[in-house]
Amino acid sequence: MRTYRVIVGKRPVAALAGIVALVTGAVVGLAAPAVADDDGETHRIFATREGLVGKHTANGHKITKRDHFVALPSRRALSAEGSGAFSVRVCRADSTRCEYAPVWDVGPWNTTDDYWSATRHAARDLPKGTPQASAAYRLGHNGGRDLFDRKVTNPAGIDLADGTFRQGLGLRHNAWIDVTYLWQGSARTGIVVTDGRTLNVRTGPSASHARAGLAANTARVPLLCHDRGQMITGSRGTTNLWYKIGAGNWVSDAYLNTGTGAAVAPSC
């Protein structure tokens, strides 16, 4: 088991609370180590269910009970309604289910905390990957208060719409999840195009493979590599081209807008 000490500059971040923060593979501390890949960095973040059915998101979308989107606490990563320019992959901590979803709202807690950025707008004394609310709740950052001076009652750094929370990840309670900020990656991307419903993500390049999760309509997904598999007819035509979009995650090109019907990623 590897142990990580979270450092800002030359001082342990946890000195803010008079302790040294340790992060291990078994215990979630201040921030899990980032995993850099062609699809962006991944951080372990505490997620809460957004709810708020009938209300409007920061981009003007009216929330429904089976919506598939996420909220992040900064407008710097807010997609326009109907767009997935900023999208994330959210996975259960045990990696058994993932969803690819657009960022359509701002929150929880803060609105200027782009904690995934190396040049974060707020709480610059915290390391990349650590939400200010998480540091406030767990380590007493800013006196245990958010950037609006409210007492922080949970360490959330992402909100999940009800459909993402329940159908996408199969969660029953707020939980720690792995979040990949897909716009940070260097891989080619494709836009999920459906009639509004979610697209099944499979464990391999055919519909007979087990379902590994969901991809929301408009989500922008990384195209890590391709293979030829089952012929599928979808919103973009008929093809046997499939893309790997994450570890054990595959979708058919029949539901992707990539700008061409040819493969745009290397062979797997």
Name these PLM-found stretches:
Residues 82-84, 207-209, 237-239:
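Residues that act as N-cap/strand-start positions at coil-to-secondary-structure junctions
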Residues 204-220:
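SH3/SH3-like (including bacterial SH3b) beta-barrel domains
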Residues 216-260:
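SH3/SH3-like beta-barrel superfamily modules
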Residues 260-268:
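Short, low-complexity, Pro/Ser/Thr/Gly-rich segments in the mature regions of secreted, periplasmic
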